[in-house]
C-alpha cells in the first residue's frame, strides 16, 4: 500500500520522516525473512528515494517537523520571486533551472513562516539523506540531492552558496557532499536491532528515484529516456547539453554518471497527477484491483465515448507553469457513461499528459532515441502504453526491474563501470515492446479533444 500524505492546507503535502524509517525497517526485516538469506551475506546497501523533499533535523538528528515533500505547492511564490530577483540568465547558466517550488525554496518558506523551527535547524537533508543518516549516523548528501533541490552550480561545479545567501540561509546548514558511488558510512548496533541487518554493512550508493530508475533501465547516454508511471509520472531524458530553453516546465538534474568532464544531465519532466488519479478512482469507485480496472477500461472504445479526464489534482504542475488546476471530469453523461468509461478516460488522460510533456521536451531539443520503462506501474497497462507509443510514434521497451532492484545492483558497481548493469538488464530482464498502432486517427482525435479542454482551463487560471 502507498504511504499516506498529510495535507493540512490546500496544496500542501507532508510525510513524517520517522514513518519512512519505520517502514524501511519493517520492509528490510521482511526481505531478509522471505528471501531466506543469511544477513551476513549482505555486502552493501543502495538507497533510492523520493526526490525534492525537505527534512530538517536538530543536532541530535531528530526531525523538527514533517517533511515538506515533492508534491507540496506552498513554495511556488517563493521560487518565482527568487527567479525574478536573480534573473533568467544567471539561473539558466548556473542552475539550469529556475529556483521553482523545490527544496531550497521550501527551506526559505520555513525560514519566513516557521522561524522558531528554522532557528533549531542543524542540517537540512533530502529524504534519502535521512535514511542514510538513520542507517549510519552520518549526515551527508550528494550532488544529485543538491541539484534536485536547485542548490548546485553547474558552472563552478559546487554548492550554489550564492543562492542560499540570496535566501538568507546559513551555509553551515548544508551537509557535506559525498559521491553517489562511495562508502557513505556503515550500519551500527542500534540499526542492527531495528532492521535485522548486521552492524558494519556499508552504504555504498544513493540517488533520487528518477536518476536511479534511469540507471536501473540502463538509461545512461544522451538519447536514452526512462519513463515511469507511479503516483507521479516522469519522463527522464539523458543529455550532455548544459543548456535549456525551459527553466520551469522542464528541470535538469545531475545524473548518476555525471562529472565535470562528462556532463550527463537528466532532463526531467514531471506529472504530479498520474497514478494517484487511478488510485483515487479505485478507492472511490470500489474496484478491487488495478487489473479489474484495466479490464473495465478495455470494454470502452478509444476516446472513452467523449469523457475527458484531466488528472492534475496533486498540486501545482511544473509542466503547466506551476498552475494548480485540479483534476477535471468532463463531458460525463449520467445516462450513458459508467465506471468503465471513467477507467478508460483516466488511463487516456494520464497517457495524454505524458504525450503533452514529451512534446515540451522535443521543443527543447531533447534527443529521444529509445524509451524504457519498468514493469511495475502504469506501463503494465496495454491501453496506457499503446496510447503513449502511438501518439509519440516511438517504441517503448518494458523490462522486469524496479528502482529497488537497480539500487541493489548499483552496490556492486564502481564509478564508471556501467556497462555491466546494462548488459545484465538486456540479457535477463526484457519483457516486451509496445509499438505504435497503425490506426492512429482515433487516438489523435481523442488527444486533440483532451488538449483543447486543457487549453481552455489554462486560459482561465
Predicted features by range, described:
Residues 173, 179, 210:
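Extracytoplasmic ligand-binding clamshell segments of periplasmic binding protein
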Residues 16, 72, 209:
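Short, conserved phosphate/pyrophosphate- and ester-handling motifs at nucleotide-, phospho-/glycolipid
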Amino acid at each position: 500500500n502507498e504511504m499516506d500524505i498529510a495535507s493540512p492546507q490546500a496544496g500542501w503535502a507532508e510525510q513524517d520522516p520517522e514513518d519512512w524509517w519505520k517502514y524501511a525497517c519493517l520492509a528490510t526485516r521482511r526481505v531478509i525473512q522471505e528471501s531466506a538469506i543469511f544477513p551476513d551475506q549482505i555486502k552493501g546497501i543502495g538507497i533510492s528515494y523520493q526526490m525534492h523533499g525537505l527534512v530538517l533535523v536538530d543536532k541530535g538528528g531528530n526531525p523538527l517537523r514533517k517533511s515538506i515533500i515533492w508534491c507540496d505547492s506552498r513554495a511556488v511564490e517563493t521560487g518565482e520571486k527568487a527567479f525574478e530577483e536573480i534573473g533568467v540568465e544567471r539561473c539558466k547558466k548556473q542552475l539550469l533551472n529556475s529556483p521553482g517550488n523545490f527544496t531550497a525554496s521550501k527551506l526559505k518558506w520555513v525560514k519566513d513562516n516557521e522561524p522558531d523551527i528554522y532557528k533549531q535547524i542543524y542540517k537540512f537533508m533530502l529524504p534519502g539523506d535521512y535514511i542514510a543518516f538513520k542507517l549510519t549516523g552520518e549526515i551527508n548528501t550528494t550532488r544529485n540531492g543538491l541539484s534536485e533541490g536547485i542548490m548546485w552550480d553547474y558552472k563552478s561545479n559546487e554548492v550554489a552558496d550564492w543562492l542560499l545567501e540570496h535566501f538568507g540561509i546559513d551555509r553551515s546548514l548544508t551537509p557535506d557532499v559525498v559521491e553517489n558511488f562511495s562508502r557513505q558510512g556503515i550500519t551500527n548496533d542500534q540499526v542492527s536491532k531495528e532492521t535485522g541487518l548486521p552492524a558494519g554493512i556499508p552504504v555504498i550508493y544513493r540517488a533520487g528515484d528518477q536518476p536511479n530508475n534511469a540507471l536501473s533501465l540502463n538509461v545512461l547516454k544522451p538519447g536514452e529516456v526512462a519513463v515511469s508511471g507511479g503516483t507521479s509520472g516522469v519522463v527522464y531524458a539523458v543529455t550532455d547539453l548544459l543548456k535549456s530553453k525551459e527553466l520551469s516546465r522542464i528541470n535538469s538534474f545531475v545524473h548518476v554518471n555525471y562529472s565535470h568532464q562528462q556532463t550527463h544531465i537528466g532532463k526531467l519532466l514531471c506529472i504530479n497527477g498520474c497514478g494517484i488519479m487511478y488510485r483515487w478512482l479505485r478507492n472511490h469507485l470500489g474496484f478491487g484491483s488495478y487489473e479489474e480496472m484495466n479490464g473495465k477500461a478495455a470494454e470502452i472504445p478509444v476516446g472513452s465515448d467523449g469523457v475527458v479526464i484531466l488528472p492534475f489534482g496533486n498540486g501545482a504542475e511544473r509542466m503547466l507553469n506551476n498552475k494548480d488546476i485540479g483534476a477535471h471530469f468532463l463531458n460525463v453523461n449520467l445516462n450513458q457513461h459508467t465506471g468503465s468509461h471513467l477507467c478508460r478516460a483516466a488511463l487516456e488522460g494520464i497517457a495524454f499528459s505524458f504525450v503533452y510533456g514529451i512534446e515540451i521536451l522535443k521543443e527543447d531539443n531533447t534527443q529521444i532515441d529509445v524509451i524504457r520503462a519498468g514493469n511495475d506501474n502504469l506501463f503494465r497497462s496495454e491501453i496506457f502504453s499503446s496510447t503513449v507509443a502511438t501518439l509519440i510514434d516511438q517504441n517503448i521497451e518494458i523490462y522486469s526491474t524496479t528502482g529497488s532492484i537497480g539500487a541493489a545492483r548499483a552496490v556492486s558497481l564502481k564509478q564508471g563501470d556501467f556497462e555491466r548493469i546494462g548488459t545484465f538488464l538486456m540479457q535477463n530482464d526484457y519483457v516486451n515492446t509496445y509499438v505504435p498502432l497503425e490506426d492512429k486517427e482515433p487516438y489523435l482525435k481523442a488527444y486533440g479533444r483532451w488538449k483543447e479542454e486543457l487549453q481552455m482551463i489554462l486560459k482561465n487560471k
